[in-house]
């Protein structure tokens, strides 16, 4: 009887030692500082909306105007494609921008979702208190957004909202204050960067 128990324990231990261990998920960096006007990532895209983007016309009910916002929040977007972080360009959603020290300081009009620089920070400045999403931002930018194509980079797409993996419709990611959205096309890096928003944001 004792021999049978010992044999069973030994078998169980042996089985546990050969059981495959699931791969560990990526790590997330300590919060990295952001300075206004900084370029975060490789310059990959031209400034502003693409030819299929907003270009001043209303997009999904979002206007390019100069109305006073009653909602003002900030979201950070990181895009990593083919193993390299790509800069989200300056002046997305900005008509006739005036740029000083790599920062949009004035414009003919602003979409309610726009970028002032190439840090990856999306500014939500709207005259209405409502929820906006990532799909609307990409529509203003004029870039594709799907489970197999992000801003022209194709392949398997992995998404994180803050440090939690997101598996739903990418376009349906709702913007929340100081949220961090990471889109990865291809291999997920060992460490995913997270950022500290500037103190005055």
Residue ranges and their predicted role:
Residues 9-12:
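C-terminal motif of bacterial Sec signal peptides marking the signal peptidase cleavage site
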Residues 1-2:
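Bacterial N-terminal signal peptides that target proteins for export
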Residues 15:
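Short, conserved catalytic or interaction motifs in soluble domains
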């Amino acid at each position: 009887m004792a021999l049978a128990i010992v044999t069973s324990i030994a078998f169980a231990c042996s089985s546990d030692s050969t059981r495959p261990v699931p791969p560990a998920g990526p790590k997330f960096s300590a919060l990295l500082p952001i300075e206004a006007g900084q370029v975060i990532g490789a310059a990959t895209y031209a400034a502003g909306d693409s030819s299929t983007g907003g270009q001043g016309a209303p997009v999904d009910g979002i206007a390019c105007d100069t109305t006073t916002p009653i909602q003002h929040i900030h979201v950070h977007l990181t895009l990593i494609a083919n193993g390299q972080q790509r800069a989200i360009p300056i002046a997305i959603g900005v008509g006739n921008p005036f740029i000083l020290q790599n920062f949009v300081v004035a414009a003919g009009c602003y979409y309610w979702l726009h970028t002032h620089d190439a840090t990856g920070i999306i500014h939500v400045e709207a005259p209405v208190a409502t929820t906006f999403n990532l799909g609307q931002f990409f529509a203003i930018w004029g870039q594709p957004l799907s489970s197999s194509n992000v801003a022209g980079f194709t392949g398997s797409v992995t998404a994180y909202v803050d440090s939690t993996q997101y598996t739903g419709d990418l376009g349906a990611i709702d913007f929340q204050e100081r949220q961090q959205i990471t889109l990865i096309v291809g291999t997920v890096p060992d460490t995913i960067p997270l950022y500290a928003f500037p103190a005055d944001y």
